[in-house]
Amino acid sequence: MLKEQGIREYLNKKDIAFNENSSIIGVIFPSKFTYALGPIATALSMQYYAINFSDSGIAIIGLNNVTGKLEDEAFLFVSKEEIASTKFNKKLMSYELEISTSKGTLAFKVNKTMVGASWHKENLATILKSL
């Protein structure tokens, strides 16, 4: 079971800012994933991602589909300066998160609740209020 504390520890090891109560889990839309060049290329085969929103940018960490643990080699940080827009589009049972940059657009399906991540639902509500 993934805990938000694990995301904090992961980002601290990489010297990336972490914002409490601002982590969610998203599922990638491979057909729209045009940003992936270089360091995140290995993450294309993965489906679930932990996403943390902070004042300095957005951290995206691949999750192992079997264990649910954070993957070291599947990491991308998009700095605040690179982000053109961030928006959540409400769908019937979920949201679609779109992060637009000059390099392309990242799109994730974000469910309202996530099994094994009890913190996800409350954090999603907090993030939706702040955007």
Segments the model singles out, each with a brief description of its role:
Residues M1-D55:
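Anionic N-terminal interaction surfaces
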Residues R8, L124-A125:
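Short amphipathic alpha-helical segments and helix-helix/interface helices
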Residues E20, V27, F53, K80, ...:
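Surface-exposed beta-strand edges and flanking loops
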Residues S31-K32, S56, E81, K91, ...:
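Generic structural motif
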Residues P39-A50, D55-E98:
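Phosphoinositide-binding peripheral membrane targeting modules
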Residues K103-E122:
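Canonical phosphoinositide-binding patch of PH/PH-like domains
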Residues A125-L131:
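A membrane-cytosol interface segment of integral membrane proteins
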